Amino acid sequence: MQVDKIDHIVLTVHDIEATCEFYSRVFSMQVITFGNGRKALLFGEQKINLHEVGKELEPKALNSAPGSGDICFITDIPLQRVIDHMSSCGVEILEGPARKTGARGPIESIYVRDPDGNLIEISNYLVNAA
């Protein structure tokens, strides 16, 4: 069996509304409601489903906890503009720019945290990198 792509991931969070506000304001993600009032963050062809800690739907991750996520987002926006945007949103840059390796090759990344402490890497693929 071969997997083609990721459809969604799940983040367990303390406050779904605060998480929705952060990701929509900082990353321009669309907040959607589905199912029985569930919330998700839609971007590109994938989404992040949100579970409130202590109220997770079954089945759930074995050790779901706020702040346990580590996600890399790819953007075509130059990292300096991303850094400026993070600053204007009041989001601290933890590290970077730093060269890393993405799924398709070399990337340059910065790192921030969301309101629950999840590590968010924001990256550009490097063109013609050696």
Could you describe each region identified by the protein language model?
Residues 119-122:
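Short glycine-/small-residue motifs
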Residues 18-19, 78:
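Short phosphate-engaging motifs
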Residues 1-6, 30-77, 81-113, 125-130:
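Vicinal oxygen chelate
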Residues 19-24, 86, 117:
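Conserved active-site tyrosine of GNAT-family acetyltransferases
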